[in-house]
Amino acid sequence: VTSYTLNEVVPLKDVVPEWVRIGFSATTGAEFAAHEVLSWSFHSELGGTSASKQ
């Protein structure tokens, strides 16, 4: 089994509205494959307050 890790810091403050939904998408073209998100975390800081979801 091949395992990959994606880690990216993206400053969204200037490009998204106050409320957003986050989703995942994957493709292999015409071939069948199973994709699993085994874990993920989200952290947000707005005006001195912070919220985390894991």
From Swiss-Prot:
UniProt KW keywords: Lectin
GO molecular function, one term: carbohydrate binding
Entry-linked SUPFAM superfamilies: Concanavalin A-like lectins/glucanases (SSF49899)
Subunit structure: Tetramer of two alpha and two beta chains.
UniProt similarity note: Belongs to the leguminous lectin family.
Protein name: Lectin alpha-1 chain
